[in-house]
């Protein structure tokens, strides 16, 4: 059975377990797909979202088949570093790169081949800086 769709759990683990990145971004500020609003346990009010934070998502999964069976999947992930400070956004993006690039995972569920950084682009939205990083890897 193929478990490629579970790769996001391992992407998250690689980021939260990286010491360089954990100094810059708390593990509860690394989000799959979107930022999760949190409520203050005492007041029940929404807590303010603070910078920096990271959003990651799978952008594609392309299976490769032969006549007989599935041989591997090529997965692409986008990791977006969000900050209100340009230098900080660069430091966090660099730490994300160190956490993911070249890493491979082999266990009973998945065989993730070394992760490759495909591209990085910068953009702004109002007073917010985004470092958009595209990663790809094969799972077989």
Could you say what each language-model-derived stretch is?
Residues 54-55, 79, 92-96:
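Hydrophobic aliphatic residue packing
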Residues 46-50, 69-73, 111, 125-131:
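A generic structural micro-feature
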Residues 31-33, 55-57, 80, 118, ...:
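Residues in well-ordered beta-strands of folded domains
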Residues 70-85, 129-140:
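Oligomerization/assembly interface segments of phage tail-like spikes and tubes
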Residues 1-60, 64-67, 87:
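Small/polar-rich, solvent-exposed N-terminal microdomains that initiate assembly or binding
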Residues 70, 84-101:
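Extracellular/virion structural assembly segments
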Residues 98-140:
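Acidic-leaning, charged glycine-interspersed low-complexity segments
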């Amino acid at each position: 059975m193929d478990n490629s769709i579970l790769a996001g759990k391992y992407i998250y683990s690689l980021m939260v377990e990286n010491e360089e990145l954990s100094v810059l971004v708390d593990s509860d500020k690394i989000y799959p797909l979107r930022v999760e609003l949190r409520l203050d346990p005492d007041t029940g009010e929404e807590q303010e979202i603070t910078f920096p934070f990271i959003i990651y998502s799978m952008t594609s999964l392309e299976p490769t088949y032969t006549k007989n069976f599935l041989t591997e999947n090529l997965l692409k992930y986008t990791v977006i570093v969000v900050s209100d400070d340009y230098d900080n956004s660069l430091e966090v993006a660099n730490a994300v790169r160190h956490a993911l690039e070249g890493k491979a995972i082999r266990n009973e569920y998945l065989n993730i081949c070394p992760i490759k950084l495909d591209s990085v682009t910068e953009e702004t939205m109002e007073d917010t800086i985004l470092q958009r990083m595209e990663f790809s890897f094969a799972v077989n």
